[in-house]
Structure formats: C-alpha cells, structure tokens
Amino acid sequence: MTATVSHAGPQVVILTGVSGSGKSTALRALEDAGFYCVDNLPIVFLEKLLELSGHTAGEVSRMALVVDAREGRFLVEAPRVIRELRQKGADVEVLFLDASDEALVRRYSETRRRHPLAGEGGTVPDGIAAERLALADVRGIADEVIDTTTLNVHELKRLVTRRFVAGDGAKLGVTLVSFGFRFGIPTHADLVLDVRFLPNPFFVPELKPHPGTDPRVAEFVLGQADAKAFLERLVDLLGFLLPRYRNEGKSYLTIAIGCTGGKHRSVALAAALAERLEGSGQPVRLWHRDVEKE
C-alpha cells in the first residue's frame, strides 16, 4: 500500500442514498470523527468549495457532504461533477446508503414524516420509487453501497467510522500534512513538528525550483545527519504514541510537518515518514498542502 498524495485538496466523502436510509446518522459519525460536514450543498459547487479550502490557513484534511433528492435539477450533474473531480486528482469517495422498501416505510411511519418525493396526495412507497429512479445514476458511480435495513443507529455509526476513519478498523488512521509556516499552521493538527532546523534547499540554485518530492531534493534533505536522526526519533516516538492513542479511543491523528514555505523540507520529511509508517503496517494518508504555492 502506498500513501495517498493529493495536491487537489482534502479527502472528500459524498454521502448519498434514499431518504430514511441513515444519511444524517452517517454524517454525524463523520462530523464526530473530525470531518468538515456540509448538508445539502448543490454538487455543482463542490469544486469551488475545494478550491476555497486550499486558499485558507485552516484547511481541513477531511470533508463530507450529503447529495440526495433535495438537489433537484442539480442531481443529474452529480455523476459528471464527481468524474471530473476524480480526473483532476481529487480524493472523492461516494457512499450510497440503501434499505429495503419495507424498512423505509416503517421508518417513515415511526417518524410520521412525508416522503420528499411523494408529491401531493402521494404515498411513501410512491416517493421511494420516484427517489430510486432519480438516484439511479448516482448509485451507479458509488464506491460502496451499504444496506442499512438491519442496522441500528449505533451500528451504522461504527460502520461508517471504520470505513472512512480508522482504515482497517484495527489501527489508528494517520494523516500526515506537510505545510509552510508562511501560510499558517493547519488548525486541525494534533501534532505539529517544525523542521526548519534543517538546511534549506531553497538556497541551492539547482534545487530551489523543485519540490521535496523530487528525488534530488529528497536526497539533499534526507541525507543530512540531523534529518536521519530526527526521522529515527520521530518513528520511535510514534511507535510509542499511536497504540496509546488508539487504546484511549482515538480513531484518527493528524500530524503536521512544517518548514518555511512548505515546498522542500517538510515535503521530503513527510513523505519519508509516511513510507516508514506504512512499511510497519500503519495506514497513512499523505497531503502536501502548500507544495504548489509560491
């Protein structure tokens, strides 16, 4: 397994599915896990939201939004928008929640709510049928479909949390973010590390134009004795911390590694740390926040 590097922005989870299937419960689970959550944002505005998140000092590394029948005429645009974002390198996953018609009718009966697509004088089964038809194309591009017919609220929350936060469900989900202090410290970071003590490739003419992902820059940074010592001590520290965080019920950890501009030193160190952690079996997400900024 290799680290996920996304210059396009944060991890995005799109929650969709039929009304009454548990989307609100799933969204609350992700919000509790640290996701920035948006309910009922027209899908056509998603790219703009991701663009804006990349121009603030407090970007989030995880975002979730609900796309459902309330989208109205925008709903037909959802498959196209999602495909285009993926083609541009965005980390977008689609989770579709479903349930049997009988379970949905029962849930509507218990809450005494009208189905949003039932129409004037229509029945809940009529609304369910209309909604399934409207969501067919979105369901077709889903990365995963979860049937919530037999799940209670707590079981669904645990399932969603394990799916999107804790990786394989047994290990702490770790996100590594490289950044530049010039652009602000990531506000959602649990641990912040400053690597500005290392020699800066910015002052080496042949290295200055290239990011820390370039092998020449990485070799320059990681070849320093202090960088090697720092990395070894950091791996040891995390080997001590991660299982203890997990035992305390923490399901995710965001580690931010910063240098001056977020282009060279922090990028090389974050990538090296991700490789070391994944080599030990620890799931890692890697995001170079500022590598393309000037």
Swiss-Prot record:
Record-linked InterPro entries: AAA+_ATPase, P-loop_NTPase, RapZ-like, RapZ-like_N, RapZ_C
GO MF: ATP binding; ATP hydrolysis activity; GTP binding
Q: Where does ATP bind?
A: 17-24
Per UniProt, GTP binds at 68-71
Coiled-coil residue windows: none
- Say which domain of life the source belongs to: Bacteria
**Signal peptide coordinates:** none
> What are the alphabetically sorted keywords of the record?
ATP-binding, GTP-binding, Nucleotide-binding
Keyword Transcription belongs to the record: no
Family matches, as Pfam families: PapZ_C, RapZ-like_N
Q: Does this UniProt record's set of keywords contain Zinc? A: no
Q: Which family does it belong to?
A: Belongs to the RapZ-like family.
Task: Describe the function of this protein.
Answer: Displays ATPase and GTPase activities.
Write the protein's name. Nucleotide-binding protein Adeh_0147
